[in-house]
Design a protein with these regions (language model features):
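Long, charge-rich, low-complexity alpha-helical segments
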Residues: 31-78
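Intrinsically disordered, low-complexity and often Lys/Arg-enriched segments
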Residues: 1-9, 77
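A short, structured beta-strand/loop element
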Residues: 7-48
């Protein structure tokens, strides 16, 4: 089984090995990107997530979701 490598634009995310354990975070926040996926998995709507994590913009969240969708749709993963 092949795995998807998701390329995320620098205007959406940042990572610093010295901060937050090197976790990938939304740009200009300390909110880890994986928090979005965890919340969606738990049944939280995107609107609720954005209300709870005010520093994350809708454009950032949708951009991350679109990048993940694109990576998972790659025919080379079949």
């Amino acid at each position: 089984m092949k795995t998807a490598a998701v390329e995320l634009p620098a205007d959406l995310v940042w990572r610093d090995p010295e901060r937050l354990g090197g976790r990938l975070c939304f740009r200009n926040t300390r909110v880890p990107v994986d928090a979005l996926f965890e919340n969606l998995e738990d049944g939280v709507s995107l609107a609720e997530f954005l209300d709870a994590f005010e520093g994350v913009t809708r454009e950032q969240a949708v951009g991350v979701l679109e990048a993940a969708r694109t990576a998972l749709a790659e025919p080379s993963l079949a």
